[in-house]
Each structure stands twice: as structure tokens, then as C-alpha cells.
Amino acid sequence: MRQHVNPLSRFFQLPRPLPSPEEMFAQSSRPLHLDIGCARGGFLLGLAPLQPEWNHVGVEIRHPLVLSAERDRQELKLDNLRFLFCNVNVSLEEWLDALPRDQLQWVSIQFPDPWFKRRHQKRRVLQPSLLIALATALQPGRELFIQSDVLSVIEPMVMLIEQSNCFKRPGDDFHPWQRTNPMPVPTERERYVLDQGLQVYRRLYQRNDQQAPELSNLEALWQQVDNPSEEEHSDC
């Protein structure tokens, strides 16, 4: 069972300086993949050896998981992978702003913590300010991939992304949910869900050429995002 932390607690509201690609990687000019909410890092530990031409960064708010993932990375001697501890909605925007143009080419948000209730909206990982920061860092054609096994978790993410008008779905994707994972390695949660015969809801987006919206405008739209079945879920 996943252990939640409250990202709005005082401890997690303290900004953390994050190392630049030059500080993390010997070959820092490689294209960058950012995995938001990487948990114990099993997905990236499997992916990084298959994509040595990429640098991979996993960010996670649960510090013990980051320490565990970093130990595994060091044992495997993966020099194109790093794990960072932070609250992405506090510390990531400045890091994204400092990246060289078009270095960030792929972003994944997979099976985020299920803050169901609307009053917990600000605890959800994909906030308007983070989406704008990602949209600003991603050049046209670069990709954002999201997936979850909980429909009421991924639907608000989809609504926020599409309300931003910064992303489009690939032209050959006509299904409500993408049927296959575009990545060659599943997450631990994905394997578990599929082994149970349950559905995974996926969306792949490409950055379009529209300018990122003003934060206040997107926040106003975000307040309209609601989960009508929220009362069916207990507090987390």
C-alpha cells in the first residue's frame, strides 16, 4: 500500500535547490526525460539501461523512497540516471526554467497519489503552475505521458492539460484511452494492475505551438475541474 504524504505541510513547502544536469551527468547535453513521482524508481532503473542516449531524472516527495532508489542506481552504476527528493510544485519550476532550450524532451507522470476529493485539489501533483512550467520547458513536438488505474485521478489531469491548449494528442490516436504504453518498461504499479486484469488509463500528449496561458486564467479553469463521485471515496 502506498504511503501518502501531505504536500501542503510546512516541511514540504520549503524550496529545495536541485542540481543542474551539468552537476548530475557527465554527458549533460543528452536529451532529458523527467519522471514525476518516481516512487522507488523501478521504472527508471529498468528504462535507463535501455536508453543510454538519454539522461533520466526521477523526482519523488517521499525521501526514503529516493534514498532507496539512489542506492539501487549506484549499485547498477547507471550514470545516465538520478533520483531527486523534492515537492515538484515548490521546487521544480525554477529548475525547469534553468534548463537549456529543448533539453527536456519527455515528461511522464504515472500513477500519482489518489487525492480524490475536490477539497484536496491542491494536493494533486499536476497543478496549473507546474503544467505551465512543463509547457514552457517543452518545445513543440515533445511529449507528456500520463497514466493511472483510477479514472477519477486521471480525468482532472486530462481536463487541466486540455484546458491549457498547450498540448495535442498524436494524430493517429483516436481512442478515449491509449491502449498500450509507449515506453518499453512498465512501472511496478502498472504490472500489478494489469496482472489483476484491471484497466490502465493512459494519455500521450505532444506539445503544440500555442503559448502557455497566464497562470490566473488556467487556475480559474482549474477551479471548474471537479470530481462528481468524490464523496464515494473515503479520506486518504
UniProtKB/Swiss-Prot annotation:
PROSITE patterns: SAM_MT_TRMB
E.C. numbers: 2.1.1.33
Pathway it works in: tRNA modification; N(7)-methylguanine-tRNA biosynthesis
Any one GO MF annotation of this record: tRNA (guanine(46)-N7)-methyltransferase activity
GO CC terms: tRNA methyltransferase complex
SUPFAM superfamilies: S-adenosyl-L-methionine-dependent methyltransferases (SSF53335)
Superkingdom per UniProt: Bacteria
Keyword field: Methyltransferase, S-adenosyl-L-methionine, Transferase, tRNA processing
Binding, S-adenosyl-L-methionine: 35, 60, 87, 113
Catalysed transformations (reactions): guanosine(46) in tRNA + S-adenosyl-L-methionine = N(7)-methylguanosine(46) in tRNA + S-adenosyl-L-homocysteine
Residue sites binding substrate per the record: 117, 149
Active-site residues, as the UniProt record annotates them: 113
Family according to the record: Belongs to the class I-like SAM-binding methyltransferase superfamily. TrmB family.
Function, in words: Catalyzes the formation of N(7)-methylguanine at position 46 (m7G46) in tRNA.
Protein name as catalogued: tRNA (guanine-N(7)-)-methyltransferase
